[in-house]
């Protein structure tokens, strides 16, 4: 002040300025004093507490900022005495709540209360023997009351936190144990009346709240402890505060009951002087032992949350039937129902929580009468550790039932969203605190849950908070987390709040709008607390260590507690949530910072899911009855929002849980309990073009992808994104990903990104010369560039192999990506002997000759041997004796020959002659090499008796054709694929004009043939498994076919004269596999070897009168009597049809009865005809009569006749070739057995004939005759059925093939074919199975049709009937009923033993000579081996030779490549030196000719030892020793030196010297092996050795030599260490004299030279020039080297 007066006295403007500054300073000091006085009453405590701990900071309710200032610690010392005295005075006033409240209200603002409650211990904590005591003190900041928050629980759930709390300041000091968390429970309420009375008292106290502390509280916001650590963060806490919230009450005298004050004084034993002490005095200096204080200055969110904790600690809960009304009674009595918490005096400054719902600070004496509809979750802030002794002194163990422990974690409140609305709907229920001697006046119907303090500033209250606490806060305190009684289903009801009726009066206030408030946390921690460890999964973590809980949270250890936060923030979400399924146009991308997080990148605008952008959003309630509104904030560090479960379709789904509703929708549980449902599949483009098709989505079976042609027009768009010709996986983040920019501030235009470049929508661009791309709304669409010059090249030149652009050096570069045109540079033509051969064409034989067959392929002529190799001996499968085999030309090939039987030309009888011998022999001896060539255009068969078609290797075992005749309409073989099934033609009534005489004559001829062939033939049954041989019937051995019961030894064929064109067996069988063998040794179902004479059959069977069959014992085909005249066969009728031939075959005796059924026919006719058979067989030898078409040349029959149109016709001009396998003078061997007939029928020839299957014919013919007999009776005049079947065969065991023709009149009509078939006994075709075959467009285009009938049963006899169903006609042409038998499933039987011995590869080389494998030369790393050459007869079986070797100690043989069979030596490389090897020689056969064979024995040999050429030793010798030099020499280096040594280094060292000196010499060929060492010291001992640098990179040293130089004068300066060469170093002397002499001599020489030149020049001047120029010498000029040199010199110039 004096300074101010002096400056004022001085006057002037400076005085005015100083006066103003002084005034401002005084005002500031005044305000500071007022603030200090106000702050002195805020923290409750004693003098000692005030001395050791400064006044704590408070927060204002201003929504914009929280100011905090620090003051010296001595300021708070002035508060203690007044506070203590007031507390004592209040304690002496009254023990009731009302009186205490009134008395406390009349006192100054420095009064404070002390609440003491008994905390019941949960049963789940066996290690705790006493209840933790927590002292809670009110502080100076007081806020207006608001309706407390309610938490809605289900009616069947416990009210987790139903405490209605008095508003307190958020600054607390709560002692903690080692777990850094305290469990506390609310006291049980007693009666409703008591609670109502206490609420009325609280309402009265609430009305006494003074609002005079507004300015004081603002000043206190600037007050701060000087030694605290400040951390600030923005939080979007509950910012809807009451209008009175900015008027904080600094003291709590008007709201603190006196009873509580007295309780605090008594319980803690605090004397008026402020020294802290407990009631038991066990820890008198607890205040001093407290290591740290934690001060938290938070925004309204934290302050209100802590107020809830204080309410929870100081009130009790009660849940009524419809409402949950909570009240708190603080007592220290021993009632088992009351839970007390003792708050120590030193912790009162931070022990008082504030209301977490309304951001208002209310003094502890302020009470509000309200009814809590639901339990109010609270949070507490535990900052100090409390000793067990202190707890034991002030806490009484309750006998009440244990209640759930709810963890409250500092800093975060997980259920604020749902609780804000509830708190506004109910009044703040505040109960006055009872004294320590007052019994608990309130009880609850249900036990209240404990409250576990589990860290700073965070709470997890009730059942709803436990799961969130576990998943988000991560505070794992085993002693405080008893979740046994906590319902985890509370999360389901978090999103909804219920407002119950209130029976008590409420005090409502107006909430201020929500604004962001910075949260300032002040922490002062000591070292031992900072070093506390956290436990998780039986693992301890230090303070500050991080722990990741899968992809959900990232937790930090903070003084024994886990501080957890979600790993994925903002728009990112955890991996595996499958959010991408919500929008199929979005791609999931990994976040670079965290691999567990994903972010969505969409190619089109997507409906944003209801998720909050940041995790730190804080809830607020805007009014009563409104649901919680989630507002995003920009503070990621704020409290995470609660994830409410979703209720959808009577189901409950967790946050981010995925639900698939069929193939219609996919739903995700979003935040706020909203189920976000979207279509599962993208919407289709309903106006799609024909170019687009839908295919199944590989990632979702319910969806389809639309794929379109990339060559779209300008107006077309491809609906499905990322689908083009690029084979990119949609899941992959391809280079042309469509990126949609953010649509927030800038509203950027969407663009496309392709290979790092940005393109606008609609922009076209080229991707090099590969593809043309366009950017549209769906993304990048690219089409491959195709040049017009590349179109139609195959049309321009189909034979061109290689094209090149014009010009040839064209290189594509945008925009010129296509050449002008293309020209062919290679069309594959070949040049052979000056003749151009087209590509893929054979070289004409007139150019290649008979040696080789050449072929042109891609410009190269490839040749191979023209003829197959011919073995030296006849093959064993020839049908004749090897002595009769000859090398004959292959038919149609004059160059090649093969083994075949020598042909024998028989005699040819004339017309009308019965040449029985020739006929029978010829019948059985049709040559094996005879073939029938059937053309497709002419109805004729050409027989070539003298030539055999060329047989390839794969055809050598097939029988050649035997002049087969095909009884079809066109004479051609029907189309068929081999099978064992057969079919039969129906029998026709025979014509009446056929004579019996001809039949009897033929019968006699046939019996004679059976007698002659009896001894050489074998009877076999094709369908029997056993093999039997029985005597054959006489007269040629022909077996009759019975129409009755089948004879056990007689196979049955089809109707007489009809050929069943069936190929041998279904072709898909492997011919190398084992196969069935019939009794005569011929494989069934396989092409046999070249057929023997016993199997050369005609395909036409003789005719027989059904009325005169032969005896079954003698057997023979039906025959025709030769009574009919034989005509010349060259002029046959032009219209002979197969039906006429069949009719003749099936005719009956004129006037005779019709044939009986099959079984009766066989039984009745057999005994009658036996005598007649014998008589006829004796009179007439048998004849084989073929029946043919008229106009078709038939094969040569044995007797020269055939039946044509019912008339016998002679074929005189066709020669008959007898059999080849048997000498001709034995007529019996020329006969043919019925088995051979069957064999020829079953086993076809090479390519033109097909045989019948005996296995099928046995049943099919037999059962078919009964049907045919009926047809014969009813339709005697019917010549043919409507539909003719040509082929009915089994192509495999389960399918058959049908080839048939329809009448020509039905061609070009519309209709279908109905096939009825059955393998059952029923004859009713209407009950048979049906199969409809539809020709293309239902049009019968041709008369011949072919169908396959699948899905049949194997080894079954099927009856088949074909019906033609016409569209517009009532006529239905049908066929007869045919039978076919499917073969059984393939059975594998071993092959038969060959009758002759054929040696294999092993047998051929069994007796081969030893190849005498020897080692001719050896080395350390290789061996050269030699062996004898193979013989010529054995070389053709060997493909190559191979050597196999191994070490004697090894187990695995190594092998050389295949060595040519003509080589006799080989060198094995890369062997180990000095190692023994075992080597053997192996012959490798050709493929398919057996196994390899080892030749001779294994030999053993050892490689030589390895020779080291650098293993020489060098010896150094000292030759001449002088005073200062020494000469050395060495020896031992091989010649030449420069091959082994690069440089010599002579190293010498004296005894006195410390360093080595050396002399180097380069090794040269033919140089001296020595050097001279100079610069030595006289009379000195030296050690010398030689070191050589070898050419292989190594070094070698010699021996060491010691020598002593001769004594002499002092040594001259030397050149030791320099590179020296022997003889180059001379002693250094006086060189000046010699130098002068040399100079003089040089000068004289120069002068002499000049004089001589002058003389020569003068003489030339006087000479005359020559008349003729000197002749030029061209010798040097003509030298080529001279010219080159001159040219080079000229060019260089």
Curated annotation (Swiss-Prot):
Residues 1657-1693 are cytoplasmic. One of its GO terms (cellular component) is extracellular space. Residues 70-205, 230-286, 311-384, 416-459, 486-515, 616-642, 910-1056, 1070-1131, 1147-1180, 1222-1277 are annotated as: Disordered. The chain crosses the membrane at residues 1636-1656. Residues 1281-1385, 1407-1506, 1512-1608 form the Fibronectin type-III domain. It is a single-pass type I membrane protein. This is Putative epidermal cell surface receptor. The lineage of its organism: Eukaryota, Metazoa, Ecdysozoa, Arthropoda, Hexapoda. The gene is sas.
